[in-house]
């Protein structure tokens, strides 16, 4: 009631329409290359659903304007947000679909221009990933030392024959695959056996002493020998043999020994000394 008692001068009430609330967070997500966010924003109003064309126009208007816009959907409908990248910019399309719609249904509802841009972007991503993987494998893998060694054909035949013979001996059991003793181990055992009176080698005495004095190490089971890995060989390849080069030989030059030259000079000088000059008429 107005304190002055004048009902005509009461203040007028102004009601402001609040902005609609932001859409709820996605409850379902499609697992694909692009982002499919499902918005189950079923309207609680009893108003009949708008026609498809009008609904799609409202969705496009909601994308263009920055202010929030309310979209009424039937209870058995959901709003799908499809986001993709085009020319470095993020683009979004809202499509009303039924609750039992699949990813293929959403793709079929997209415009043809959108599908072409998405396929082009996915192809660029695949090419970039392939180049990155190739670069990673090329530069991150350790450098292999198994490069073929160039040998001459005669060495190649000899090496291949020796490898085949060794492989046959390993398969037949003539070459054991157990680790052989190192040189320092065998020398130590030999030195222990020579520690007897007079420094003589006595293997039987050491074996008897070892059997008479049992130790913890002898009672314990001996560890199994580490098996030797199969023999691995380096890669070899015969070098291409070049044809022999025919170099023209120089004509052979004959050289007379020095003694023969001296004898010939002496013979000539003696003949000149004993020659009788002709009489001059």
From Swiss-Prot:
Record bears the keyword Zinc: no
GO molecular function, one term: DNA-binding transcription factor activity, RNA polymerase II-specific
Matching InterPro entries: NFYA (IPR001289)
Known tissue expression: Highly expressed in certain parts of the gonads. Expressed in the spermatheca, intestine and in some neurons in the head. Not expressed in the intestine, the hypodermis, body wall muscle surrounding the pseudocoelomic space, secretory cells in the pharyngeal terminal bulb wall, in the small ganglia surrounding the pharynx and in the neurons running anteriorly to the sensory organs in the head.
Biased composition (Low complexity): 204-220
SMART domains: CBF
Keyword vocabulary terms for this entry: DNA-binding, Nucleus, Repressor, Transcription, Transcription regulation
Basic and acidic residues bias: start-end ranges: 166-188
Compartments in which it is found: Nucleus
Subunit structure comment from the entry: Forms a heterotrimeric transcription factor complex (nfya-2-NF-Y complex) composed of nfya-2, nfyb-1 and nfyc-1. Interacts with the nfyb-1 and nfyc-1 dimer; the interaction is required for subsequent binding to the 5'-CCAAT-3' box motif in DNA. Does not interact with either nfyb-1 or nfyc-1 in their monomeric form.
Name of the protein in question: Nuclear transcription factor Y subunit nfya-2
The organism's taxonomic lineage, starting at the top: Eukaryota, Metazoa, Ecdysozoa, Nematoda, Chromadorea
């Amino acid at each position: 009631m107005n304190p002055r008692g004048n009902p005509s001068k009461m203040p007028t009430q102004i009601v402001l329409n609040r902005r609609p609330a932001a859409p709820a967070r996605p409850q379902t997500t499609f697992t694909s290359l692009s982002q499919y966010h499902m918005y189950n924003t079923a309207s609680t109003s009893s108003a009949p659903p708008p026609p498809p064309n009008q609904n799609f126009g409202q969705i496009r208007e909601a994308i263009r304007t920055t202010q929030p816009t309310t979209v009424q959907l039937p209870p058995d409908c959901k709003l799908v947000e499809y986001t993709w990248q085009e020319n470095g910019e993020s683009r979004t399309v809202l499509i009303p679909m039924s609750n039992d719609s699949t990813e293929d249904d959403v793709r079929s509802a997209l415009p043809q221009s959108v599908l072409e841009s998405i396929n082009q972007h996915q192809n660029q991503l695949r090419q970039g990933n392939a180049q990155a993987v190739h670069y990673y494998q090329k530069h991150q893998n350790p450098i292999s030392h198994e490069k073929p060694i160039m040998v001459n054909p005669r060495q190649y035949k000899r090496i291949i024959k020796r490898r085949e013979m060794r492989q046959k001996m390993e398969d037949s059991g003539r070459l054991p695959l157990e680790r052989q003793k190192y040189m320092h181990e065998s020398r130590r055992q030999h030195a222990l056996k020579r520690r007897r009176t007079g420094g003589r080698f006595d293997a039987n005495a050491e074996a008897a002493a070892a059997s008479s004095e049992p130790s913890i190490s002898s009672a314990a089971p001996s560890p199994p020998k580490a098996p030797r890995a199969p023999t691995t060989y380096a890669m070899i390849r015969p070098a291409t043999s070049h044809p022999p080069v025919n170099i023209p030989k120089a004509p052979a030059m004959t050289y007379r020994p020095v003694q023969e030259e001296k004898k010939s000079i002496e013979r000539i000088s003696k003949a000149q000394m004993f020659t009788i000059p002709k009489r001059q008429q």
